[in-house]
Each structure stands twice: as structure tokens, then as C-alpha cells.
């Protein structure tokens, strides 16, 4: 499951669980983007912060893992590079790329689109009532997930306004956001400090 995860919220987790159940997936790999090319002009939290929040959010589910392939790769993040790396790591796996409705709506503008179709089956998750075009392709599936009404943008806005995000994001992520002053204009000690204090492993894979 690819995404900025800035921050990861319960909508992401429910969507991943629903897709895993529907398609009988053995594992869901969360892949936080490094430098998302679509958001180069927008402020995005440091990759290590987003990676660690994803690790915290997924730790209790044995079917969920987190990959650093995009975080560790220099330069802008493109899905084609993500899928190539995952294919190299899992040559015998049937890959499903799970992403949100907003990303699926732009998929035809993505880099190396023809190769993308050959590398994975794409699953677009959306909130009920949101119309999403499956482009008539057998390798694209659409799935409505009620919890996708939660958005990372709304979570960031709430934090910036001093409003709570409990029950929108996992408890550990709420505490992480508060500890490092994310989204509230507080001083950010940086991802290296976060790594040192949390003692997280370099990778969960």
C-alpha cells in the first residue's frame, strides 16, 4: 500500500485490512513515499517521521509490514520504481498496489504506465458515494471503504488548530505527533532524533 502517510490514519489501516480480506492477501506492505513527485511544491513531513508513524500504526497486525524502499531511494518517488524494487524483493509474489481514489484518478499521468500495468494489479480504495473510473481494465479493481472518509489533510488541519485527532489516527501515532510537534508549527528535532529515542529498527522487513 503506497502513500504519503502524513499522518497514517485509521482509514488507511481499515482499507488495507479490507483489501487483504477481499483478495486473500498474505501480507500488506505499507510503503511510505520518500519525496512524492506529485507534492514537490507542498510541505511534507520528513520521510523518517512518516516511516516511523507507519511502523507504530501497523505494529499490532502480523499481516502488516512496512518497507523502506521509497524512503531510502534518493530523488523523487515514482510508483514504477517502487514496484520494480518490490518485484525484485518478491519475484514470485502476485503484487497488488493499493492506493487512494485521488491517486487512481491521476494514474494515466504516471511514469511508465504500460510497465506499471504489467507489474501489479491496482486496487483503488474510495469512500462510499465517490465515483471512481476503473478505466475498463481487468487489472484495476475499485473498493469502497467507509473509513476512507478520514483524510490526512483533515488530521493535519485539526492538529494545527489545536483540535484532537484521537480515534482518527492510532494512539501511538497521536503521541508521536505530539512528541515531535508535527503539523503544529513546533520545533522539529528531526528524524534522526526520532530514530534514536524510539530505538526503532532500520526496517521491519
Swiss-Prot record:
The UniProt keywords, alphabetically, are: ATP-binding, NAD, Nucleotide-binding, Nucleotidyltransferase, Pyridine nucleotide biosynthesis, Transferase
Family per record: Belongs to the NadD family.
Q: Has keyword ATP-binding?
A: yes
Q: What is this protein called?
A: Probable nicotinate-nucleotide adenylyltransferase
Please name the CDD domains in this protein's record. Answer: NMNAT (cd02165)
By its UniProt entry, which InterPro entries does this protein fall under?
A: Cyt_trans-like (IPR004821), NadD/NMNAT (IPR005248), Rossmann-like_a/b/a_fold (IPR014729)
One GO biological process term: NAD biosynthetic process
Q: Which reaction equations make up its catalytic activity?
A: nicotinate beta-D-ribonucleotide + ATP + H(+) = deamido-NAD(+) + diphosphate
Function according to Swiss-Prot or TrEMBL: Catalyzes the reversible adenylation of nicotinate mononucleotide (NaMN) to nicotinic acid adenine dinucleotide (NaAD).
- What GO molecular function annotations does the UniProt record carry, in alphabetical order? ATP binding; nicotinate-nucleotide adenylyltransferase activity
Q: What is its EC number?
A: 2.7.7.18
- Does this entry carry the keyword Nucleotide-binding? yes
| Pathway membership | Cofactor biosynthesis; NAD(+) biosynthesis; deamido-NAD(+) from nicotinate D-ribonucleotide: step 1/1
Amino acid at each position: 500500500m503506497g502513500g504519503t502517510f502524513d499522518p497514517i490514519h485509521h482509514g488507511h489501516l481499515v482499507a488495507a485490512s479490507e483489501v487483504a480480506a477481499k483478495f486473500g492477501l498474505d501480507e500488506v506492505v505499507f510503503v511510505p513515499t520518500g519525496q512524492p513527485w506529485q507534492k514537490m511544491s507542498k510541505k511534507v513531513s520528513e520521510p523518517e517521521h512518516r516511516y516511523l508513524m507507519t511502523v507504530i500504526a501497523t505494529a499490532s497486525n502480523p499481516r502488516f509490514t512496512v518497507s523502506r524502499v521509497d524512503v531510502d531511494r534518493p530523488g523523487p518517488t515514482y510508483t514504477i520504481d517502487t514496484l520494480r524494487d518490490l518485484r525484485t524483493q518478491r519475484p514470485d509474489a502476485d503484487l497488488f498496489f493499493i492506493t487512494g481514489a485521488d491517486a487512481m484518478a491521476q494514474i494515466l499521468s504516471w511514469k511508465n504506465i504500460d510497465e506499471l500495468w504489467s507489474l501489479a494489479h491496482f486496487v483503488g480504495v474510495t469512500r462510499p458515494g465517490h465515483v471512481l473510473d476503473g478505466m475498463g481494465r481487468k487489472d484495476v479493481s475499485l473498493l469502497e471503504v467507509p473509513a476512507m472518509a478520514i483524510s490526512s489533510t483533515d488530521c493535519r488541519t485539526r492538529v494545527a488548530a489545536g483540535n484532537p485527532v484521537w480515534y482518527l489516527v492510532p494512539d501511538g501515532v497521536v503521541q508521536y505527533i505530539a512528541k515531535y510537534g508535527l503539523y503544529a508549527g513546533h520545533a522539529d528535532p528531526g528524524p534522526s532524533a526520532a530514530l534514536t529515542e524510539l530505538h526503532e529498527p532500520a526496517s521491519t522487513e
